[in-house]
Regions:
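Conserved acidic residues
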Residues: 146, 187, 558
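Structure-specific DNA junction-binding interface
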Residues: 5
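Hydrophobic helix-and-loop "lid/oligomerization" segment in the mid-to-C-terminal part
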Residues: 2, 10-147, 167-168, 219-447, ...
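Acidic-glycine-rich active-site phosphate/pyrophosphate-binding loop
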Residues: 74-75, 181-191, 530-535
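Histidine-centered active-site/metal-ligand motif
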Residues: 176-177, 375, 434, 525
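Mid-to-C-terminal polyanion-binding domains and interfaces
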Residues: 75-79, 323-329, 335-369, 402, ...
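Short alpha-helices
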Residues: 99, 182-225, 234-246
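Histidine/acidic-residue-rich, glycine-tolerant segments that coordinate divalent metal ions
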Residues: 150-205
Length: 590
């Protein structure tokens, strides 16, 4: 894939701030630049950024309907009602259910002789689909639940919540997806994206909204028992939040940064029993978990439960305090993930073949593929893989029941796929999501018209530069800049993710040092050993063995890369994780 390189230049004012931070914090110019690029203007702001504080969390009662939600929850608690915690089957939904269940379970154990009952429900991906289902409400009625708390779903469940009301069941909605034109008639609708909600931070995960409800209840009814800082009691729950934030690809800014920071600390210091087991199965070294481990190792395993079997298995793992059961459940979850990998690999091959056989595909601005036999649990992953391959807004669909097909959508940088799908909503039976990812369903008879209208919308609204991936480079470094102290500053910028990306750097006019060569089973990767004639560094470039001979022949290259640590034989070095390599040329910042 060909990338655009966009090198960030500092304005004159930013350069002054950089110099001031360098002086006041006693850090290198390159390190100060990393802070400036993140909008940091003072030494105090820098300290607050690298040392997140729970005190910086917003008052949960700023969220519309929070007062109503807390009072209805309190009523259920003191009257001994049965509460059903209802969540989606993905990581965000299952962690949200586990968070709320743990919070209320701990509360119940401390309120003796007051008692209230808890249950939870995860819809079946295949028989019920996403969100609040009729079956779930019937389950609540059959089990005498008088209050449902929905997590990571419910914002568009107008008819389903009306159905719950008809059965005498109250509902509190905790969701973060984009609301529709009509809100459900629930006791409380907690969603910071409501047009009438003044809550200052708009990017919480579904689990994050659930946490704000727990925070609000604690603040109102438990603070006197937990003083001086009632938030400390909620600290263990942040490990579930970190998982949801990492896996749901929400911005790691503001409150999400604070919650993810403390959540990763909790996972490394005192993980829940089930999470400790899944970390062991995933091969994560104790006390060294990073947000990348959540994104690429833990999240996919938890998601695999809902994709291949049932999200309930994930919640059971997240709730258990039995180490024997946790290990058994973690092994089962791992098995589901292996099945998922095999399935998504085969489906991706079939989808790519379908596109390659389509003579019109080369001229289209969007990708829509469908096959009736594809596994519903992997269409989102396949959509992501197709987006990575062709870099176009992508929808992958498969068959359901009664002529209904459903699937997942993924977008490219800067393009709002939710709005694009919404332009075709008269053809859909259901859809929801946000700017970069969505789910949708329609009758099979509408597929052809949908493809045509979706393509027309994308073609009219997408810019040419959005059809080519861009590497947003934060700084040009000399190899002499790459020191242990500089790398230590980078580590303090973690956790990385959307809104706080892992820094990309460029170093220019590098040549072979000693041992640049192709590596890997198929000799498809490139091990770099390069120098700027003064300093040297090693690195790895996956899938770029095509550049081996060029570099070995003495030609100079420009390299775009991230930095990480590599430990071999107990010796740790800083190395490049290469994103792109091009022949040396004059580069300018944009």
């Amino acid at each position: 894939m060909t990338y655009q390189w966009n090198i960030r230049c500092l304005t004159a004012v930013e350069q002054e701030v950089q110099q001031q931070l360098e002086k006041e914090l006693n850090i290198s110019s390159a390190a100060a630049r990393m802070l400036v690029v993140r909008g940091i203007q003072t030494a105090d702001e820098a300290r607050a950024f690298v040392r997140p504080s729970l005190d910086k969390l917003h008052d949960p009662f700023l969220m519309k309907d929070m007062d109503k939600a807390v009072e209805r929850l309190h009523q259920a608690i003191i009257q001994g009602e049965k509460i059903l915690i209802y969540g989606d089957y993905d990581v965000d939904g299952t962690t949200a259910v586990a968070l709320m269940y743990r919070f209320l379970q701990d509360l119940a154990s401390s309120l003796s002789p007051l008692t209230f009952n808890l249950d939870y429900y995860i819809p079946d991906r295949y028989t019920e689909g996403y969100g609040v289902s009729t079956q779930g409400i019937d389950y609540a009625a059959e089990h005498a639940c008088s209050l449902i708390i929905t997590l990571d779903c419910g914002i568009k469940a107008v008819e389903k919540i009306a159905y719950a009301n008809s059965k005498g069941i109250d509902v509190i909605v905790c969701d973060h997806h984009t609301p529709g034109d009509e809100l459900p008639n629930a006791v409380a609708v907690l969603n910071m994206k409501r047009s009438d909600c003044p809550y200052p931070y708009k990017d919480l995960s579904g689990c994050g909204v659930g946490f704000k409800l727990a925070q609000a209840y604690t603040q109102r009814y438990l603070a006197s028992r937990l003083s001086p800082n009632s938030l400390i009691a909620l600290l263990p729950l942040t490990q579930l939040l970190a998982m949801s934030i990492a896996s749901d690809i929400v911005p790691i800014t503001g409150e999400n940064r604070i919650l993810a920071y403390f959540g990763i600390q909790q996972l490394n210091q005192a993980p829940f029993t089930g999470l400790s087991a899944i970390m062991q199965v995933a091969g994560i070294e104790a006390k060294k978990l990073t947000i990348n481990d959540l994104v690429y190792k833990i999240g996919p395993r938890i998601n695999a439960c809902g994709r291949m079997k049932s999200g309930r298995a994930a919640v059971e793992l997240l709730l258990t305090d039995d180490p024997v059961f946790a290990r058994q459940q973690a092994e089962e979850v791992n098995h589901h993930n292996e099945d998922r990998r095999d399935c998504d690999s085969e489906t991706t091959k079939e989808a790519l073949a379908q596109l390659q056989e389509d003579p019109t595909f080369a001229n289209r601005r969007s990708t829509v593929v469908y096959a009736p036999h594809w596994h519903k649990g992997v269409v989102g992953i396949v959509a992501s893989r197709l987006t990575e391959t062709y870099y176009r807004p992508t929808i992958v669909l498969t068959a359901g029941e009664d002529g209904i097909i459903s699937g997942s959508a993924r977008s490219v940088g800067g393009f709002d796929i939710y709005t694009a799908i919404d332009s075709c909503n008269d053809l859909l039976t259901n859809f929801g999501g946000h700017k970069y990812a969505a789910g949708l369903s329609m009758h099979i008879d509408n597929l052809l018209e949908f493809k045509q209208r979706f393509e027309a919308y994308v073609a009219d609204h997408i810019r040419e530069d959005q059809l080519q991936p861009t590497l947003q480079i934060e700084a040009e470094l000399q190899l002499a800049d790459i020191t242990k102290s500089f790398y230590n500053v980078l580590r303090h910028l973690e956790p990385f993710g959307p809104g706080n990306p892992r820094p990309l750097f460029v170093s220019r006019h590098l040549i072979n040092h000693r041992d640049t060569r192709a590596v890997g089973k198929e000799r498809e990767h490139l091990r770099l050993d390069v120098t700027d004639r003064v300093n040297a560094i090693t690195g790895i470039a996956f899938g770029r063995a095509d550049m081996a001979e060029y570099i070995q022949n003495g030609n100079a290259v420009d390299i775009c890369y991230e930095l990480n640590e590599n430990t071999f034989n107990h010796y740790t070095t800083i190395q490049m994780m290469v994103q792109d390599i091009i022949p040396n040329k004059k580069l300018s910042c944009c």
